[in-house]
């Protein structure tokens, strides 16, 4: 049944009114909520603010490296140390290695551009920092609704955004209501801030409806895959931050790794692959597993135990790929717009800062008696902020690196180290990631080694330790515009790339009795990384929100 059918039979939906509704309980959304309530307290005015979060709890779906620049969180909550923020492991040492298959070359610290240096930053679990931000928001009176995904944008008669509706509960696989059916709820607001993270489901719709991407470069993405390990205490160096480039990726494939030493004898190890890669046989997950076999990495992990796993797409386009940030009734904030600084491999500080800027614009608009118009003060304040300066200096990073590791490294070194990012030229992204795959007939198949179950693993055992769970009796949230495309186009032309780019074994080609192929979608495995929505060559796969509370539950990630 369609939404309209359900409303006709079971409606109308209940509704709640707020001054500001925030979609997404990550660092951007929670920072916006906190800033709104801070301003309301300073002015001694009432302000209704709510946050919708699709995860089962705040932090459940948050995955990042992460090394945090504390500049933005210090602006938001100056006494964060006294309030117990989980930023406790300061960076003690930076290492950067270029890897070959069996060797490595270390870059001296003095030769690293400033954007690769992390003195004054903290090795964190962004999931735990987000949980702490949630506590700060609730203490200020923000209403937070975990397990309630925003599934639909609501519009006023004049076309401006009115708010959002949460997803229905109790729809069966056949699309019909079950005995547990409940209609979603409408949340109306004067302004709605969309903070869904990279490749936001509703953000995509807003980009299309309001033509927000006109004049912007294509957005480009990476897939980040991460594991949490407990290692031998004798190998543990709290605060050590290591990045690598090179092997196992080919020169023309953008990507690299991170290995951060946290507290409690734990390290996080991860791998990022740019989704503009061309060979359909490439598997980002398998490249990550192969990377861990390098002597420099094996030496750290061997004898340890893998604790958790996750994956998430990240925006990498930078300043030139930012869309228009505002539209009548709302704004895109954080990675829903694409504020991550790829040259620093950091986005949490940008999410917090843009959350604050959007909140300040929304607060002033509400106090002025405005509603449902464009929050033009938000992009204006961004353009005069330190964040804009930072992103402007790094605006060519991804473009240079997409030209190959060697040329990219030289040019980034010249721009960032010698010239401090102050260059008169600007490079542009020309293509979307989904346009980049070559036909399989033009590419060399890649044979990956089998996992050993100690250092390297398969995808199903990895998904298991991501604590991913979905209600089984619900429609698949990975939808196909045309069910014939996976076999007739993706399998025949590209050798079924969705079976490789997905880090959770969601997509599986199996043989029918007559020997033909068909695609099976194991939606219950989905870790909500959004890679399929980005990389599918014909954009036939569309990720939509599953029933609330579904997906991963990342501890300490």
Question: Where are these predicted regions, by residue range?
Answer:
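FAD-binding beta-loop-beta segment adjacent to the flavin cofactor pocket
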Residues: 311-342, 462-473, 486-501, 508
